[in-house]
């Protein structure tokens, strides 16, 4: 049912990113997951956890990261345990594991990227996803983020040293909705609802649409089998990453 009336269909496909929680609740699916541990015991955890994804842009020249032969560079992702010092004050920012990613901004504003996100310390039903992104009055990147990210850029590539003042201040970032193990769920519910809860893996999901379409038409995918919802109760979990990013 919608504000425009009832829409009938044979199959519903839900791929709603950070709004996965809302559709999950509409379907009255469980708010907790039963997870079978290595010890054989069942553990109960919240079905969803929201993370705040912090991102920004440093206003360097558009070709600042071009390769020696003039081509566009790849997305750079770095996880490190090296001490990180401020590019401005040289003070220690962290001596714990940290991570960043960066690439040329698609609008030509410089270099865009982010740091490892942080957990929103609220029950998932209390998190306001809307208004989303730059429109959110509650979830925005901080000054601490800009100092950390710009300093990490300088740590990774000397060409960024002394460039922290070029950071473009403004609203940025957004929420991510993570599953209990931070890996996606691809599964069918109530016979004709297919859920793609991608846990913000983004670019890694490029090939999923075709696999999901084939499953809906009756050809089960061996690649998607490990991502069924019942993996939690069966204890068929994915490896735990040591990365500070929940989707790595």
Where are these regions (language model features)?
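C-terminal catalytic lobe of FAD-dependent flavoproteins
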Residues: 119, 123-131, 137-248
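Helix-loop-beta segment of a Rossmann-like dinucleotide-binding subdomain
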Residues: 1-9, 191-198
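Flavin-dependent oxidoreductases
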Residues: 2-139, 154, 160-162
